[in-house]
Amino acid sequence: MKKIICLLLILSFAASLISCDTLFSASNTINGEYLSDFAIVYSDEDLDYSFRAAEYIQSEILNRTGLDLPLIEDSKNPVCEFEIVVGNTNRAISKKLDAETEGLEFAILADGGSIALEADYFIIAAAAYFFVETYVLEMDYDATIPEEVSIHTPIVKKARNYILLIGDGMGINQTKMFEYLENDVEYGDGEDIFYGYYLPYHGYSRTASLSGVTDSAAGGTALSCGHKTINGLIGRDKNNKDIKSLTELAYEKGMAGGVMSTESKVGATPSSFSAHADGRYESAEIILSQANARDTYGTIIDCGYDYYTQRYVSTVIERHITDTLSKLEQNENGFFLMYEEAHIDKHCHNNNLNLAFQAIVRFNQAIGRFMEYVFYHPDTFILITADHETGDLYPNANGKLEYHSTDHTGNNVPVFAYGDGAELFDGKTVENIQIAHTIAHFMGDNNFGDQSNFTYLGK
């Protein structure tokens, strides 16, 4: 009999815990309405950015409160009494929101039983993260969202992840192609702007090597190792001695490292971040050095996907980006990753404006996915630049873009930065090696590379 009574007491106690947990979840409210009564709505006519933002909100609410809110498409479901509306939908609240935002700004509005989040392209990810961090807590709460349009900027935290995006051959006018060409590229977002211009901090970089106008080997080595070197050398200084790369520095700091490119892994730029060789065409030497990097440093080298169709850009390339980031983020100390779009350079060598534009749009797609990651992981610094300009591209007398060379030039290239410390690059024209110096400084090394003439920014 005593055993039965004890068992009943245990079951009663367990039931009380379950009921308390249920009460805990049910007592979470937004503007006085139970969070459990809301559905999350996304636009099936909008870009995938909005769908992924809606998924993120759903997942975070489940993780934080135990509530599994329904995720529904805008056009296929009637209006619910209480909704969290993500992106540009046909819901009345979306039309009411319709805010004028600039750069990385996003808008939030509460109206009646609905809440709406709105932003351009990938910036909706920043809105989703802000919404969850601000209004979805892990305890009993009653959050209040203003019933008037509020404009916000993304949350930024101290950086522990570093992403360097390189558009090979991408000069200033390559990023301006959207002003001259119609974007009917099938795998694009229909965008009319290079995504770097959404970032708040812009500057320029000088690209000369010790040989004069740089090639991709010396240009890549400058960005990877913080040394000016001789054309053709991979990860080596002017005396042909191996020099430390940011990828290797990451390993020293206990971080993960990765190298990605649409070029093959023995291409000059990915090689500069993953190998040491006395010639950019020494493929056997480069492959052996990269094998050592994988074995010694655990460097992820994922290269060689030159696709120009919706199917492959939206699945293969974007999946590779997602998978690589997922592997790198497993390191609790953070990571360094370089990603290169290699084919802007190749098409500019051939003076093929349309194919170069397709490569720029493809680079934009990669930038969008990386920026999504940054917004969901605000402890990430990101910088977009080029190793050099190719083709001497600028408008002719009739206002049309025109090539004036088939080779590399000494033209300055753009720098776009976002995240903790990114303001150091704003409005400045820097040497390419200073980009490496400054990222290394952020990673905790103030003596990285050759700083005899130029140092990290902020010193």
Which residues does each predicted region cover?
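Positively charged n-region of N-terminal signal peptides that target proteins for export
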Residues: 1-4
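Hydrophobic core
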Residues: 9-13, 17
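Solvent-exposed alpha-helical segments and adjacent loops
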Residues: 21-154
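Extracytoplasmic/secreted envelope proteins and their assembly/folding machinery
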Residues: 51-58, 125-129, 220, 244-247, ...
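Functional beta-strand-loop-alpha-helix junction segments that form "active/interaction loops"
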Residues: 68-72, 237, 306-322
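N-terminal catalytic scaffold of extracellular/periplasmic and nuclease hydrolases
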Residues: 147, 153-305, 309, 364, ...
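Active-site His/acidic residue clusters
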Residues: 267-275, 308, 312, 321-325, ...
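Active-site neighborhood of phospho(di)ester-bond hydrolases with catalytic His/Asp-centered motifs
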Residues: 383-386
